[in-house]
Structure formats: structure tokens, C-alpha cells
Swiss-Prot record:
This is Urease subunit alpha. Belongs to the metallo-dependent hydrolases superfamily. Urease alpha subunit family. Ni(2+) 2 binds at residues 219, 248, 274. The modification N6-carboxylysine is found at residue 219. The active site is at 322 (proton donor). Carboxylation allows a single lysine to coordinate two nickel ions. SUPFAM superfamilies: Composite domain of metallo-dependent hydrolases, Metallo-dependent hydrolases. Its main location: cytoplasm. It comes from the Bacteria. Pathway: Nitrogen metabolism; urea degradation; CO(2) and NH(3) from urea (urease route): step 1/1. The keyword Heme does not apply. The gene is ureC.
Amino acid sequence: MPASISRSTYASMFGPTTGDRLRLGDTELVIEVERDLTTYGEEVKFGGGKVIRDGMGQSQRTRAEGAMDTVITNALIVDWTGIYKADVGLRDGRIAKIGKAGNPDTQPGVDIVIGPGTEIIAGEGRILTAGGMDAHIHFICPQQIEDSLHSGITTMLGGGTGPAHGTLATTCTPGPWHIGRMLQAADAFPINLAFAGKGNASLPAGLEEQVRAGASCLKLHEDWGTTPAAIDCCLSVADRMDVQVMIHTDTLNESGFVENTLAAIGGRTIHAFHTEGAGGGHAPDIIKVVGAANVIPSSTNPTMPYTANTVEEHLDMLMVCHHLDRSIPEDVAFAESRIRKETIAAEDILHDMGAFSVISSDSQAMGRVGEVITRTWQTAHKMKVQRGRLAEETGANDNQRVRRYIAKYTINPAIAHGLSRHIGSVEEGKRADLVLWQPAFFGAKPDLVLLGGMIVCAQMGDPNGSIPAQPYYSRPMFGAFGGALHASAVTFVSQAAEEDGVGERLRLQKGTLAVEGTRDIGKADMKLNAHRPSIEVNPETYEVRADGELLTCQPLAELPLAQRYFLY
């Protein structure tokens, strides 16, 4: 006879199932399980007296016969594709199958085979997401990578050479020599990396050599002169060599206004950094570009979300990051022109509408590398509190909003930079760059981070304890060491560099993967974040209107996922 148990008992044993709801961290965001790919009564679970034992949930099948390397059991997947429960099978560092795990010789409907060679990660009661991607990195110091990885980011893209003054201000790794050295340095780190060359030039040769050397993209930055000629030259090279271009436009409007920049771009695909403008760009109306079909607009996290302290801290940040001097009136005026509470407030709302597509950090250059994920969910919380449920929500949940916001640091930056065949979502065939969270700590502290199917960091207690005892904090794991590091992580390069054998030429120990498909995309390709409102900015009051509607909201004085989570 079938047995019946209460929902609460079931959830405590196997995790939530279809129709169950749970809160994310201490936010006001509530998700509901949309479907469950496991089978009631045939769930697999590891442990003493549990299902995954020889002849029961574990089959006799070898790896050659299809058994998985690792199975994550009963996980609640939170992804742009949906919010659902499933077992996840990993093989060769990729997601082989999402469905029902077990022993096909004793259980029905099994499409993920557990064998003697299969490791188990218990996903019951945990949330599984894709590893995050931070697409705006100043590689100022290598210690950033640890902070980023332990926050749930598994891919970092940007430029720099260390604390050189060019890197302190701009996300560029300039020239073939520096690109080669940074590609070699990447071998030391348990994270996927990609480097941006300097895109500011009026003739193509200096840009082409950087792409051939291994730059996966090119960065136009106003501190190097983002003129119409440089924009056109850079995009022409990118179109020929299939790499993305990121742009930090001309705050001072010296070489033109936002309309001139859009004319120079000429309808070609471009990723616009900190499109609100506090991080830099045409003052006061760079935010207009969110309405362009060819522009992928992103935010950096210091303005996300708008709080009581946002404006005050920005002036000091800006003076330091852009090598400005408080004793020079022009430098102070430059800084003040970029910090506008009206456009910062509008940015939150435009994210909630799906008009901004990406969130990134701007690490140590007006951004916090370990807070991309936290600030994304703080913004989603703020908008839920201030704007209520999205009109498109169904049921007593925030699933649509949650799917929209998770896309901003997973699939959308991956699409923008030609990496979505490999990363960006929990889908079969993609790299097993995955993050497991306890729901109470979601967005603040990951439980486990996997890179290429190997655990690279995790919450861990006292190594000398008889059991892993408190205090728990995030520590590197075996996947972050030795040859496992090189087998788990990859470095993304241009197709030209991949075809030229950059890995062999530089004797790289990590594998390399080529970016692809960066030029035939646009705003419409941004998952759940493709809205294109017509934006107007009042040049005197800085008020922002979208399709005629005034966009304004109040700063919050208190946020979730904050001090109560970070005692140590």
C-alpha cells in the first residue's frame, strides 16, 4: 500500500516538492517549486539505512556503462529556465543529465545511473544555481579571485595587470606581452578567467594583435580616449574577429554626446558598462542607451541597490579610482557630475522592469568583487518591498522576479561574451560550474562551489574536530589544488588565439575555450531582461522617465543579507 506523509515531513527528508514555497535568506522574496522531476516513493538519498546502497539505489553499472561521476540528489534548481526540483548527474566536468537518479535495475523512470563509482552530493533542502559570472573585473590584485569564488562566482572576465595605474582605472590588459603574462598567471587560480584587451585605437593593427594574443574581448574606456574614431575602429575589429566590445563612455562629453556615441556604434553589438552613469559615461544621460536594440546594458554593484549611504560613499570612491585630485576644481566637478541620486534611483526600477540586463562588480575600482550576488538579491528585495509583486507573476510567489534577477549574473553575461555554450545556466551539456546554497543563507554564503564538477570551496568547520564543527567558514577544497585545479577550470580566449594554439605557445596548464557568437546578438537575446523603454533624462533635475513614466524610489536604510550574516 502507498504510504502518505505530511508535506513538512516530506520536505525535511527529501526537500521541498511541487507547490512548496520557501523564503530566500532574510529577504521578502518567496519562491515556489514549479515541478518535480523525481518520483514519489522512489527518491534516492545517501546515508545509513537510506536508499543509495548496493543493489538498492546503487546499480552495478560501471562508468563505461553510463554511471555518473557525481549525482546531486533532490536539489531545488533556481535558474532563469525555471524553479524546479531534480537530481543532477555530472560526468567529465559537465552536466550530463537533469532528471531522476537511481538504479535502473530496481527502480522505474531512472535516467541518471548511480554506480559503484558515483559520488553523491546531498541536495535535499538545498538550492542549486549556476555559478555566477562577473563581467567587469579590474584585475588589481589576485586576492580578488578568492573573495569572488567564495561568494559563488565561477567566471571572471575583465582586464588589468595588477596595481598599475592603468588597471586601477580601466579594465584593460594592454598588448600581447601583458596578455600572455596574465594568461600564464591564470593557471594558478581555481576559477574560469577571461581577459579584455585595450580597445582604444584609431587604427586596427594594435587591436588585432591583442585578440590574436588571447584577449577574449576589447574594452573602450574614457580614460584612454573613447572617441568616435576609436569606437568605430574597435567595433570593426570585433566584427571581423568575433569578440565582444565593452564601453565606458565619455563622462565629460568632450568628443560628443550620447547620441554621437550611438551614431559611432552604428547599430553594432556592444556591452555598455555601468549604464546608469555613476561608474562613468555621458553625463547625465548615458542611461538612455537601455532603449537601444544593439546595446547590452549592465550595472556595477556600488549603486545597487540605492541606499541611504550610496551617494555619500561614491565621491570618495571616484576620486581614488580615477586618479583625481581634490585640490583641482575641475577634478571635483568631474566627480560630482557622475553622482546623481535621481539616475541611481531609476536604475533599481529599470532592473526590476528587465531593462538593465547584467549586474557585475567593477572590482576595487568603484565596486566590490565579493558582493555581486548579494547585491543582486538585495536589489530584488528592495523592489519587492517598494513596487510589490510583478504584474507577470502567477501564484503566491516571486518566481518571475527571481528568474529575472538570477539571469543578470549568470546567463546574460555569458551570452553577451560568447560563453553561453559552456556556462551560465543549469542545463544539460554545460560545464558543471554550480553553487549549492542553504535557503537561509541564499545570496550571502554558498554551501558548496563546484567548478568543472569538482568541489573547489565549501563551508567547513574545524579541521581538527572529530566532526566538521562550528565555526564554519568558507575554505578552499581539493579542486582548488594541484592538477585538479588545471583540470577543473578553463581560460576563455578568442577564436583567433585558440586556432593559433595559444595554450601550447604559452605552455598553459589550464584548458582554453574559444568565445563565439558575440556579434549577432543584442538586447533581445538577454533572457528575461530584454525590455527597451524610451528613456528621457531632464538635464537640469536629472529626473528619469521611461515611456513617459517618472522613475523614482526612496533609498533603503536597512537591507537583508547584511550584517547578521557576516559575523565572521
